[in-house]
């Protein structure tokens, strides 16, 4: 009925054994993900698919798992977060190559959570600078590194964040069930 399926390979699920090996924090562990993608190519009928998402929201996984520590593996280490983010870039690129070799017609990309990041004080130079850095790190750093290894970008938008310096200073309403400030106009 006009519905086109998208296969999402990785949506933050990390097996315990992979986590015990430090998951995506170790570059050598990317090989396990590559094997998973290759096995999936052989076991699924990917010839009938057109779209594959290799990674869902790598920025969200990295920040909540390795910066805020709110989600597994519940670490608070910016350096580890940077390694994880970099290794997810490598994992995507390698997966892209494996999938294209298996079926060159596939359209492959990531689902990116892109936030509307704004300065709380629009004319304050420090807030503007921080906002530009945050926007780049959250929205564009990953996508810029995979630009030659993607056929599309899945766009997920959930919130607007306002920054005063390095502190998030969002209005208190309206918020969703996760406590995220909602601003539908931010998608424009």
For the regions a language model picked out, list residue spans one by one:
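Non-catalytic scaffold segments within catalytic domains of secreted glycoside hydrolases
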Residues: 1-188
């Amino acid at each position: 009925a006009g519905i086109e399926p998208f296969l999402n390979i990785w949506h933050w699920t990390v097996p315990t054994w992979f986590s015990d090996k430090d998951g995506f924090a170790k570059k050598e562990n990317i090989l396990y993900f590559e094997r998973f993608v290759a096995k999936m190519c052989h076991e699924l009928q990917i010839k009938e698919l057109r779209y594959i998402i290799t990674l869902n929201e790598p920025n969200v996984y990295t920040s909540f798992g390795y910066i805020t520590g709110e989600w597994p593996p519940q670490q608070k280490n910016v350096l580890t977060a940077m390694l994880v983010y970099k290794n997810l870039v490598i994992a995507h690129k390698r997966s892209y190559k494996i999938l294209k070799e298996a079926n060159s017609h596939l359209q492959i990309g990531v689902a990116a959570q892109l936030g509307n990041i704004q300065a709380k004080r629009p004319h304050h130079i420090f807030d503007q600078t921080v906002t530009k850095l945050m926007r780049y790190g959250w929205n564009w750093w990953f996508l810029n590194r995979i630009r030659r290894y993607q056929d599309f970008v899945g766009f997920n938008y959930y919130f607007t964040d306002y920054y005063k310096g390095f502190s998030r200073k969002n209005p208190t309403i309206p918020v969703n069930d996760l406590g995220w400030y909602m601003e539908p106009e931010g998608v424009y």
